[in-house]
């Protein structure tokens, strides 16, 4: 059998058919690629939506993060401790005040002083209203089973009077120094401002910064101590 002659038109037809086949294959591949890309985009969009939903639930839900709950608990505990501390401080202050008052009352009962006498540091003091010379003041205190006050630094810090009173200090001309009424020497620094060489002089007292030499024949009020 004789083969049909190959003509240019036949070649063109074959070429067109091959070109169409290639385009069809190419379009098919492109379509598949597009479909795959679209699927990936849809999947990524789905993941993103799911992630946002999870964040909304964790951020806006009813369940608070643990650190918020912990801070609330700690804040409440701090307020409670402050309230307890305030109550304890008030109670301690009140108890201390009551104990101090009770102690003073008990000490006053244990160390009672006669009427018109003042109690201080386990001693009783009498502040006279009458004025006498120093020697007569001595005798008046002796009649009350006491003596003219022999002051110490604590008493000088405590007693601040409105006027001058006789105390148990006089100037001894023979020894040329100030002595207590029992002739003992004054402690160093006590009544240090009194001047020497004061014949027939005794000491009068008003406060720790106000005491002076006074002629023993002058009349003053006096302080007795026992």
From Swiss-Prot:
The keyword Transmembrane applies. Glycans are attached at residue 145. GO terms for biological process: natural killer cell activation; negative regulation of natural killer cell mediated cytotoxicity directed against tumor cell target; positive regulation of natural killer cell mediated cytotoxicity; positive regulation of type II interferon production; stimulatory C-type lectin receptor signaling pathway. This is Killer cell lectin-like receptor subfamily E member 1. Residues 1-68 are cytoplasmic. Residues 120-225 form the C-type lectin domain. Expressed in natural killer (NK) cells (at protein level). Also detected in natural killer T (NKT) cells (at protein level). Has little or no expression in T cells (at protein level). Residues 90-226 are extracellular. Disulfide bonds join 113-124, 141-224, 202-216. It is a single-pass type II membrane protein. SUPFAM superfamilies: C-type lectin-like. Lectin-like receptor for natural killer (NK) cells. Can either inhibit or activate NK cell cytotoxic activity, depending on its binding partner. Heterodimer formation with KLRI1 mediates NK cell inhibition whereas heterodimer formation with KLRI2 mediates NK cell activation. Plays a role in allogeneic recognition by the immune system. Keywords: Cell membrane, Disulfide bond, Glycoprotein, Lectin, Membrane, Receptor, Signal-anchor, Transmembrane, Transmembrane helix. Pfam families: Lectin_C. PROSITE patterns: C_TYPE_LECTIN_2. It is found in: Cell membrane. One of its GO terms (cellular component) is plasma membrane. Heterodimer; with KLRI1 or KLRI2. It comes from Mus musculus. Residues 7-18 have a biased composition (Polar residues). The lineage of its organism: Eukaryota, Metazoa, Chordata, Craniata, Vertebrata. Residues 1-28 are annotated as: Disordered. Disruption phenotype: Viable and fertile, with no gross abnormalities. Development of natural killer (NK) cells appears to be normal. Cytolytic activity of activated NK cells against allogeneic target cells is significantly reduced. The chain crosses the membrane at residues 69-89. Gene3D superfamilies: Mannose-Binding Protein A, subunit A. GO terms for molecular function: carbohydrate binding; identical protein binding; protein phosphatase binding; transmembrane signaling receptor activity.
């Amino acid at each position: 059998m004789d083969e049909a002659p190959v003509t240019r038109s036949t070649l063109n037809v074959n070429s067109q058919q091959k070109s169409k086949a290639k385009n069809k294959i190419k379009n098919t591949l492109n379509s598949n690629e597009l479909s795959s890309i679209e699927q990936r985009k849809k999947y990524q969009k789905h993941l993103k939506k799911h992630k946002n939903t999870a964040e909304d639930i964790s951020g806006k839900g009813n369940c608070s993060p643990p650190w918020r709950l912990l801070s609330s608990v700690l804040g409440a505990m701090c307020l409670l401790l402050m309230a307890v501390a305030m109550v304890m401080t008030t109670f301690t202050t009140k108890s201390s005040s009551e104990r101090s008052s009770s102690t003073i009352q008990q000490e006053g009962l244990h160390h009672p002083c006669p009427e018109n006498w003042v109690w201080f540091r386990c001693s009783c003091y009498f502040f006279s209203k009458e004025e006498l010379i120093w020697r007569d003041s001595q005798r008046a205190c002796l009649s009350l089973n006491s003596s003219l006050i022999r002051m110490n630094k604590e008493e000088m810090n405590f007693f601040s009077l409105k006027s001058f009173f006789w105390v148990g200090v006089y100037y001894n001309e023979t020894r040329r120094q100030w002595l207590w009424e029992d002739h003992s020497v004054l402690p160093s620094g006590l009544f240090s401002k009194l001047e020497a060489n004061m014949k027939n002089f005794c000491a009068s007292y008003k406060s720790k910064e106000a005491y002076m030499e006074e002629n023993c024949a002058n009349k003053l009020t006096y302080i007795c101590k026992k």
